[in-house]
Regions:
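Peripheral (often C-terminal) accessory segments that flank ATP-dependent C-N-forming ligase machineries
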Residues: 5, 15, 140, 306-400
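ATP-binding N-terminal substructure of ATP-dependent carboxylate-amine bond-forming enzymes
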Residues: 1-105, 138, 369-370, 378-398
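A conserved helix-loop-beta module that forms one wall/lid of the active-site cleft
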Residues: 94-163
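Short beta-strand-to-turn element immediately C-terminal to the catalytic PLP-Schiff-base lysine
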Residues: 134, 164-169, 203-205, 365-366
Length: 400
């Protein structure tokens, strides 16, 4: 019997642990990526073949390439390692008729298109900020008259806070829509809901959430992305009532959206105005910015590795979570003024990971108590802001 073959869409340099786990489980691993990424430090020992193309984002070219290669290489699973790969991977699954082994194009929209996300969440009884599509002028005018500002004009398919504009008047909203031109229809407008932003990092098996870790951002990502500053997130104390409430909403989203099997990073806002939880966005992938490293040191679960196991056992075999730890961890990350910042003065024993990326500084810390994690993050954020932090204007698109 031939080994199971995994085709991984890799539009960004990430997911090495996923590929290594697939290989360790005996799979044949194909990594499909843009030409410019083939020289990155991939775990080539775990990749049977790198398929690199200069036309990675052209759907017909991708299908032609994979169809030709598929004459001699069977593809049993098609996986998207990054947010921007989700739609193309779904398109390929539809083409190869593997929609029973991952998201098809309709369900993939719920994990990429913020307008589709909100409509679906609302239909299954999950609270969302007030929103409107940008297709019809009269609907927009009605929305702006009915819903108090400020408002956010958001790209429907960008990741994180890229491209979001905060508008304080209806005039600003219309000006932003005019600036978008033909891209206007690929945006939405929603009310700004001030609050505390949480993210849930999950694993799903057979349509049910089997692992969910609730984490809290230091401040909303929009504030960090557009105002500069230092990014931080941490394990939220597991005995707090917010954790149970957010897990309930998270399960509604992932099970209602039809993820089926895999990993997810989902965000909720606890609103200052009413204490209720509002769904912000979800995804069908592992969170970025060292989130997976943080979760692993807090729980013992490596999201990339466990996601690989879940993909492998879709049609046969049983999946079991590894033993869980009950520790706490946090991440702090910032752009740096220095190309290679000297972090030797950060010497606390709780540091379990140091970011190695030009013009960036970052750490993952882990401890037995949430108080110690918060103490370290607060100290590091202050030092980084003072001695290292660099601020660039917020971009309209995420740059890989």
């Amino acid at each position: 019997m031939r080994p199971l073959s995994i085709l991984a869409f890799a539009g960004y340099f990430k997911g090495g642990r996923f590929l290594e786990r697939c290989k360790a489980e005996g799979c044949t691993v194909y990594a499909f990526m843009p030409e410019e990424l083939k020289t990155e430090a991939w775990p080539f020992h775990a990749i049977d073949e790198v398929i690199a193309t200069p036309s990675y984002y052209t759907h017909r070219h991708v299908l032609n390439t994979l169809s030709y290669l598929g004459r001699t290489r069977p593809f049993d699973r098609i996986v998207a390692l990054d947010d921007f790969d989700v739609e193309m991977a779904a398109h390929a699954r539809e083409h190869f008729r593997l929609t029973n082994l991952g998201l098809g194009e309709s369900n993939a929209r719920y994990f990429r298109d913020k307008l589709a996300m909100r409509e679906k969440a609302k239909s299954i009884g999950v609270r969302v900020p007030e929103f409107v599509g940008t297709f019809h002028n009269e609907a927009i005018r009605d929305f702006l008259d009915r819903v108090p500002g400020p408002w956010l004009v958001k790209p429907r398919s960008e990741a994180s806070a890229a491209g979001i504009r905060k508008c304080h008047s209806s005039h600003e909203v219309w000006r932003r829509l005019d600036d978008l031109g033909d891209d206007r229809a690929f945006a939405l407008i929603e009310e700004l809901v001030p609050g505390d932003l949480f993210h849930v990092d999950s694993l799903v098996c057979n349509g049910k959430v089997i692992f969910a870790e609730v984490n809290a951002y230091h401040q909303p990502l929009l504030d960090v992305y557009q105002g500069g500053g230092v990014y931080a997130t941490r394990t939220f104390p597991r005995n707090r009532p917010e954790v149970a409430a957010i897990k309930v909403e998270n399960a509604k989203i992932l099970e209602g959206f039809g993820l089926g099997q895999g990993a997810s990073h989902t965000e909720f806002m606890k609103a200052h105005r009413d204490g209720q939880y509002y769904f912000i966005e979800t995804s069908a992938r592992v969170g970025g910015a060292d989130t997976a490293t943080m979760v692993e040191h807090a729980t013992g679960v490596n999201l990339w590795s466990e996601w690989a196991k879940l993909e492998i056992c879709r049609t046969e075999g049983k999946y079991e979570l590894p033993p869980l730890k009950q520790r706490y961890a946090g991440v702090v990350v910032s752009l740096a003024k220095q190309e290679n910042p000297d972090t030797s003065s950060f010497d606390d024993p709780e540091i379990v990971h140091r970011m190695d990326m030009k013009y960036h500084i970052g750490f993952v810390v882990a401890a037995d108590t949430p108080e110690r994690v918060q103490e370290l993050l607060s100290k590091y954020m202050e030092r980084i802001a003072r001695d290292f932090n660099a601020v660039l204007p917020g971009a309209d698109k995420v740059s890989h």
